[in-house]
């Protein structure tokens, strides 16, 4: 499907609405399992489907909805008008504008519910990365690129991929019942070192206050210094 076709967006949206509506209505329906699938009881001689089968139906509807949500979120950035909406800003506020992060954690179900639960954790992790490594301005550039994939730079793409992998590891550490004492991946330092060596590719970082934290101190050998030498 062509993501630039708004009819595709409409199709994904309709799938989400239909699956969600059916899922929400299932508990209030008397369902039966017939040779042709599920049906509503309208005859006193027909035995309703078991709770287990009904729950399985609800789960399958939720999975269908989540697949449609993922497809929709992957397609929406191709619509210029959507990029200027509050909804876009919400999903673009982290490095994970789609449900990919749930897949990276090996979670198959429920994807959308898990994504919404993970967002506060992701936001806390990215705040730490902003203040200690990347800076707000450069993170905003990376987030926009994660959403739109508009950059032609292989280096930028590789940095974003590495940064997201670091975040996934940090999420795993936070979700672990026995988190590591020092869960910060060394890859973050490596990312900063690469950024330092390529000022033309990462202008926002080099123009930020965070860059000064990574500039080596130059010893000037002043007479007042204890280590002064002739």
Question: Model segments located where?
Answer:
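Conserved short "hinge" loops at termini or chain/domain junctions
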Residues: 1-14, 28-230
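Catalytic-loop motifs flanking and including active-site residues across diverse enzymes
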Residues: 17
């Amino acid at each position: 499907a062509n993501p630039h076709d708004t009819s595709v967006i409409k199709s994904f949206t309709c799938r989400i609405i239909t699956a969600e509506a059916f899922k929400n209505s299932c508990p209030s329906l008397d369902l039966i399992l017939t040779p042709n699938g599920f049906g509503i009881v309208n005859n006193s001689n027909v035995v309703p489907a078991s709770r287990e089968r009904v729950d399985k139906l609800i789960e399958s509807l939720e999975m269908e909805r989540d697949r449609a949500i993922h497809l929709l979120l992957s397609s929406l950035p191709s619509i210029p008008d959507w990029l200027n909406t509050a909804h876009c800003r919400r999903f673009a506020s982290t490095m994970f504008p789609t449900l990919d992060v749930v897949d990276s954690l090996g979670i198959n179900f429920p994807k959308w519910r898990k994504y919404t639960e993970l967002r506060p954790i992701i936001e806390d992790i990215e705040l730490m990365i902003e203040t200690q490594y990347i800076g707000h301005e450069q993170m905003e550039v990376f987030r926009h690129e994660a959403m739109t994939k508009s950059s032609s730079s292989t280096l930028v793409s590789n940095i974003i991929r590495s940064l997201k992998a670091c975040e996934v590891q940090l999420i795993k550490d936070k979700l672990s019942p026995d988190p590591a004492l020092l869960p910060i991946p060394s890859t973050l330092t490596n990312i900063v070192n690469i950024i330092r060596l390529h000022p033309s590719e990462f202008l926002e970082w080099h123009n930020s206050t965070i860059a000064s934290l990574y500039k080596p101190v130059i010893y000037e050998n002043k007479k007042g210094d204890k280590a002064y030498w002739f």
